[in-house]
Amino acid sequence: MKHLSIDLETFSATDLTKAGVYRYAEDPAFQILLFGYSIDGALARVIDLASGEQIPDEILAALTDAGVVKSAFNAAFERICLSAHLRRHHPDLLGEGFLDPAQWHCTMVWAASLGLPMSLDGVAKALRLDVQRSEEH
């Protein structure tokens, strides 16, 4: 595995827009509901953590593997949320720190550098993609 693409759906009792991602992810009610991923561009898979499914061990290992590039749209959000999740549920993998930002590529930044909008929906519309994010969160 050389590349891991990630997309999260999360919940927190803290308002992200008012408090920021760090306080959002540290809220006691914070949880990752869905963990979507693709390994090396293969078909995407979704883990339903809210229903009790678990992130596979190989994916957990890849999250802390410096040899695996992690990418996400708004990678800082995914990285901070995954760091909080790992500290709570897999402290042996991360301890008290955060996942290394040097191992992450942000597709939102790439999109912006190409003059595209800095929202996932905006990029999908600008590129006229058939598959767009649901308005229901």
Question: Which residues does each PLM region occupy?
Answer:
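Entry/capping segment at the start of metal-dependent catalytic domains
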Residues: 1-30
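Intrinsic disorder/low-complexity segments enriched in polar/small residues
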Residues: 10, 136-137
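Active-site-proximal helix-loop-helix substrate-binding element of RNase H-like nuclease domains
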Residues: 30-32, 36-37, 41-58, 64-136
